[in-house]
């Protein structure tokens, strides 16, 4: 049923596609005017991580293909990723560029508000309709014909503008939170570089002064009673039983049991005897595949066992504070070193445990380790809080889009007096 005052129309009643120009690869330069290609169009964002440039004078010679801040572009070839359309808006003055083939500019008609159209294009329902229209095509290409094969609810322009204003407010909140997350991550990286190397010493709460004393260089195997991994064989799965965790079940602070397969009581007990059950204060590390992607400390009893894709460190608590080591192995520089120097496997890369045991690390006293870990853990918690806030904002906006873009929820349009 069409909401009162709305019309069911083809998306082409709101906008048209203006395709880019077939610039030659031989025209490319090291600098000049940005060249917007299909690879630059992401889900809701323009990505300039792979910049290409054309001569400056092309802006005048091909001015009808010039893009500027505020323009909306969409990928024409393979236009969707999952249930999202590759559509984005140029948001900066520095986004000024020339439009390449296989990308189109969205040109709104008199019946379409540009911000409303942008929100419509970003909705899951719109991407779904595009995917349906492209079924069986190879390669899938977005065209006017595809757009003419389905209809969307089109409210009057004043209502379009009000809907767009509401959804744009959520976009701003999402963008602000994303920037805060990125800033917090950069701040934490800077803290890690200072605290985990001893360049910056924290205050010892017992003395009220900065920690003192030289840091000690040790081998990982000397400060851990175990440096091992989980089971090297995989028992038969059962419907109801104990979880058997692998790398795919790891998350930043623990296991996600919903993805784990389960094994029988007998197999579980046998693997417990083989020391495949983590204990409190153990440090678990992604050993195979996504090396060091996850590294966390076991904080409560785990009623499950681990496979060999997970490494287990059991620290000597008089030498090592577990959270300090977990933070140490989460450094990008350490991940890079381990990935390059301590792995094997032409297919799936794996940490070589005998080499891993011999890795040298510099550690301060346990009290200083605890203080460093507490500061970095607080930074992690701040990031986690912001990420939870971001997820909430995105979910709220998604629910609003489903209501507002279908007319299930109507808005009050401001009337000029």
Please give the residue ranges for each predicted region.
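Non-catalytic DNA-recognition/assembly elements of restriction-modification systems
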Residues: 1-20, 149-157, 207-229, 358
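Amphipathic alpha-helical coiled-coil/heptad-repeat segments
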Residues: 1-5, 154-210, 362-417
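A short glycine-rich beta-alpha junction/loop motif
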Residues: 4-7, 95-104, 112-115, 124, ...
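Sequence-specific dsDNA recognition surfaces
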Residues: 10-25, 41-72, 221-235, 249-280, ...
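Short coil/turn segments at secondary-structure boundaries
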Residues: 24-31, 132-134, 233-240, 257-260, ...
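A short beta-sheet element
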Residues: 37, 51, 58-122, 246-247, ...
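A structural connector/turn signal
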Residues: 61-62, 137, 149, 210, ...
């Amino acid at each position: 049923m069409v909401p009162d005052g709305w019309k069911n129309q083809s998306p082409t009643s709101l906008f048209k596609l203006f395709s880019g120009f077939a610039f030659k690869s031989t025209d490319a330069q090291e600098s000049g005017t940005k060249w917007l290609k299909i690879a630059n169009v992401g889900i809701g964002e323009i990505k300039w991580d792979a910049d290409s440039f054309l001569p400056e004078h092309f802006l005048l010679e091909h001015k009808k293909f010039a893009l500027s801040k505020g323009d909306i572009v969409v990928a024409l070839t393979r236009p969707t990723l999952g249930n999202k359309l590759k559509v984005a808006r140029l948001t900066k003055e520095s986004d000024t560029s020339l439009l390449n083939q296989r990308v189109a500019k969205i040109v709104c008609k008199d019946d379409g508000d540009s911000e409303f159209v942008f929100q419509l294009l970003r909705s899951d329902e719109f991407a779904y309709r595009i995917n349906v229209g492209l079924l069986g095509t190879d390669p899938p290409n977005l065209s006017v014909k595809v757009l003419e094969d389905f209809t969307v609810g089109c409210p009057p322009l004043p209502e379009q503008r009000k809907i767009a204003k509401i959804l744009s407010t959520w976009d701003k909140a999402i963008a602000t939170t994303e920037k805060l997350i990125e800033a917090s991550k950069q701040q934490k990286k800077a803290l890690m570089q200072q605290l985990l190397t001893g360049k910056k010493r924290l205050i010892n709460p017992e003395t009220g002064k900065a920690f003192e004393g030289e840091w000690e260089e040790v081998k990982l195997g000397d400060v851990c009673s175990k440096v091992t991994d989980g089971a090297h064989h995989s028992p038969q799965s059962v419907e109801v039983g104990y979880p058997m965790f692998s790398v795919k079940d790891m998350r930043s602070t623990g296991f996600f049991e919903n993805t784990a397969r389960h094994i029988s009581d007998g197999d579980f007990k046998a693997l417990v005897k083989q020391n495949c059950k983590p204990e409190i204060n153990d440090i678990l590390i992604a050993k195979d595949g996504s090396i060091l992607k996850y590294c966390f400390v076991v904080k409560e009893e785990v009623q499950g066992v681990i496979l060999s894709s997970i490494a287990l460190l059991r620290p000597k608590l008089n030498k090592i504070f577990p959270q300090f080591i977990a933070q140490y192995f989460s450094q990008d520089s350490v991940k890079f070193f381990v990935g390059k120097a301590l792995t094997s496997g032409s297919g799936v890369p794996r940490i070589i445990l005998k080499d891993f045991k011999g890795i040298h690390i510099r550690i301060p006293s346990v009290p200083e380790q605890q203080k460093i870990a507490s500061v970095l853990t607080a930074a992690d918690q701040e990031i986690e809080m912001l990420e939870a806030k971001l997820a909430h904002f995105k979910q709220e906006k998604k629910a609003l889009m489903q209501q507002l873009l279908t007319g299930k929820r109507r808005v009050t349009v401001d009337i000029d007096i």
